[in-house]
Regions:
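Helix-rich effector regions associated with P-loop NTPase G domains
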Residues: 1-180
């Protein structure tokens, strides 16, 4: 649909139905999509996790903390990061050895989204593992779901997400008043 805007040289072109690729929110049912896409205030939680701990974003994807090899014992600091997503997405911290059981037994229950209606179809998607190292004031975006922002780095993680999910590294939108 093309509309000429009166009293201007502007023309508005509407392209309904064009869906950008790579959004996790498009890989679930409509009800889950409504829970993933923020409509009001978003949820945020700050974490200071040890290596081999895992943070689940509902039953949609998870990130595992890895050890940063470059640091010597005197320089070792625990990374601090904040996770952001819609209030409809549950953050859950667990041990690495419990992830498979948590996903199998609790997706659609305490781990939402996905819901019981689309969890089986979602689990059939091919998943990928990627390793990322982020520095202070960098963010990793999980397109169509949320992001993490590193407050104190370096943060080395392994992400487990659907193969078609796009992951983007960017500078932090909001930075602390002073770097630590």
């Amino acid at each position: 649909m093309v509309n000429k805007i009166p009293n201007t040289d502007l023309t508005l072109v509407d392209t309904p139905g064009l869906i950008p690729k790579g959004r996790i929110s498009d890989m679930v049912c409509q009800d889950c999509n409504l829970n993933i896409v923020p409509s009001k205030e978003i949820s945020r939680m700050t974490f200071k996790m040890k290596p081999n701990k895992v943070l689940l974003f509902g039953g949609l994807m998870w990130i595992k903390m890895l050890e940063v090899e470059e640091q010597n014992e005197e320089e070792k600091v625990k990374p601090i990061f904040t996770a952001f997503a819609s209030k409809g997405v549950v953050f859950h911290e667990t041990n690495e050895d419990r992830v498979e059981d948590m996903i199998k037994d609790h997706t659609g229950g305490i781990l939402t989204p996905p819901c019981n209606n689309c969890k089986d179809e979602y689990r059939e998607l091919a998943f990928k593992k990627e390793t990322w190292t982020l520095d202070t004031n960098e963010e990793l975006v999980f397109k169509g779901l949320g992001w993490i922002s590193v407050k104190r780095g370096p943060l080395k993680i392994e992400i487990n997400a659907p193969e078609d999910a796009e992951v983007i590294l960017r500078d932090a939108f909001i930075t602390p008043k002073r770097a630590r």
